């Protein structure tokens, strides 16, 4: 293991830069914090570049696994002050890993998600986690959607991000030409979601927290669906609605 004693170190500067979207895109890299997430990442095909641990980090079995994967020279030890300067969490567990972003892969699922301009990192992370738990491994996103590799989104996925393929949606007609039926979650002129998911290949659109799905995507959808509600609430949080609809699509 290597000991780093200055915030001027190139690895420290890199991790600090990865807190900003433009540098994540520039370097095609992102980072994650937390023991559980990093353990899960070891089961994926994401390339881990290096790990930073706080000097009081105690999980020796995880350190051993990381040394086997990366070599000792890519395990970097920091004192508490330097580690705190790069940590994105209030109560860090003392470990940060840096990864290469994975290039888009071929669609592997008959059931897909499309995120349309969703902004809240917590919502996106929860949706990713829910989708992966039902074996949805490809998620499309439109321009205006928050960065799925931002630290808050990555942490909120609780490790599910390492098992999902992310693709920017350029033209929904391409999905339709490949046999996918498009389901738009909206309130107007919509049918009940309980019995709506009847196609073999389906793509579910979840829309922006405030304005919902864009008119263009709604117009190109094959079915408009809504969740039956019996109480007084007029709508649900997008992550909550997404969980219900993902379950109904996959059951």
Language-model region placement:
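Glycine/small-residue-rich loop that forms an oxyanion/phosphate-binding "nest" at active or ligand-binding sites
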Residues: 75-96
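Amphipathic alpha-helical repeat scaffolds
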Residues: 34, 119, 123-126, 236-239
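Active-site/ligand-binding-proximal alpha/beta "capping" segment
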Residues: 185-233
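Short acidic-hydrophobic, aromatic-tinged amphipathic segments that line or gate anion-handling sites
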Residues: 3-5, 76-79, 164-171
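Structured adenosyl-cofactor binding patch, chiefly the S-adenosyl-L-methionine
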Residues: 130-134, 145, 153-162, 215-251
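Short, aromatic/basic amphipathic alpha-helical patches
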Residues: 60-70, 217
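Boundary-proximal intrinsically disordered activation/regulatory segments immediately upstream
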Residues: 1-58, 145-146
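RNA substrate-binding interface of SAM-dependent RNA methyltransferases
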Residues: 98, 106-189
């Amino acid at each position: 293991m290597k000991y780093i004693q200055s915030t001027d170190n190139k690895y420290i500067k890199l991790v600090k830069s990865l807190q900003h979207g433009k540098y994540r895109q520039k370097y095609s890299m992102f980072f994650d914090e937390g023991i559980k997430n990093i353990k899960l990442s070891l089961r994926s095909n994401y390339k881990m570049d290096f790990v930073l641990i706080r000097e009081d980090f105690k999980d020796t079995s995880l350190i051993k696994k990381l040394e086997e994967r990366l070599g000792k020279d890519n395990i970097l030890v920091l004192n508490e002050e330097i580690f705190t300067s790069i940590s994105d969490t209030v109560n860090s567990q003392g470990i940060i890993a840096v990864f290469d972003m994975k290039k888009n892969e071929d669609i592997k699922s008959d059931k897909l998600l499309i995120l349309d301009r969703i902004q809240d990192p917590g919502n996106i992370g929860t949706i990713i986690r829910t989708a992966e738990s039902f074996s949805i491994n490809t998620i499309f996103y439109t321009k205006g959607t928050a960065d799925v590799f931002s630290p808050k989104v990555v942490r909120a996925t609780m490790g599910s991000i390492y098992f999902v393929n992310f693709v920017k949606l350029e033209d929904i007609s391409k999905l339709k030409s490949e046999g996918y039926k498009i389901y738009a979650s909206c309130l107007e002129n919509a049918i009940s979601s309980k019995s709506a998911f009847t196609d073999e290949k389906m793509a579910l659109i979840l829309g922006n927290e405030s304005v919902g799905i864009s008119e263009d995507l709604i117009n190109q959808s094959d079915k408009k669906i809504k969740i039956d509600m019996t109480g007084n609430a007029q709508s649900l949080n997008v992550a909550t609605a997404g969980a219900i609809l993902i379950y109904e699509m996959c059951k």
